[in-house]
């Protein structure tokens, strides 16, 4: 039973308290962060597509809208609407990037990784090379995640650094005197008259 628990135990770097820590860069943690961001990226898109289909009166076709590049077209309202929803998805994912990653130096890497995985998924689903319109949309979406994600994560880093500087780790220790310190102070007071007498004898 003990051995089974040992295998079922979650590694320390994969615990929720460690996933969102900024000072850990273990491969397992980075891999989990990529998976979480990809899940939120597609989940947000599904919610946006569902709301848009209900409001605009379109038949809901999640698989085609998510994993196909053929719907991305800038020459009609239908294709433009889907493109704008993808850009809105990237804008919302800036928040998830800030919370999950939280490091400005890694925002660029994670933004590119999300869209690289999306390209692989789309290519495997359609078995065709995407169009120029789709690639242009991915570039715009990547720029949103890179620039806004870098700005928000840097703001978070500066905020954490500012508040850490205001907290004194030694606060609360002032005024506390240990018994050993009391004994040393008492011995110093006892030795001071002797030193004064020695000075008087020398004079």
From Swiss-Prot:
GO terms for biological process: Golgi to endosome transport; Golgi to plasma membrane protein transport; protein localization to Golgi apparatus. There is a cross-link at residue 15 (Glycyl lysine isopeptide (Lys-Gly) (interchain with G-Cter in ubiquitin)). InterPro entries: Integral_membrane_SYS1-rel. The modification Phosphoserine is found at residue 192. Residues 53-78, 126-131 are lumenal. It is found in: Golgi apparatus membrane. Residues 1-29, 102-105, 155-203 are cytoplasmic. Keywords: Golgi apparatus, Isopeptide bond, Membrane, Phosphoprotein, Protein transport, Transmembrane, Transmembrane helix, Transport, Ubl conjugation. GO terms for cellular component: cytosol; Golgi membrane; trans-Golgi network. The chain crosses the membrane at residues 30-52, 79-101, 106-125, 132-154. It is a multi-pass membrane protein. Present with 238 molecules/cell in log phase SD medium. Necessary for the targeting of ARL3 to the Golgi. Involved in protein trafficking. May serve as a receptor for acetylated ARL3. Belongs to the SYS1 family. PANTHER family: PROTEIN SYS1 HOMOLOG (PTHR12952:SF0), SYS1 (PTHR12952). This is Protein SYS1. It comes from Saccharomyces cerevisiae (strain ATCC 204508 / S288c) (Baker's yeast).
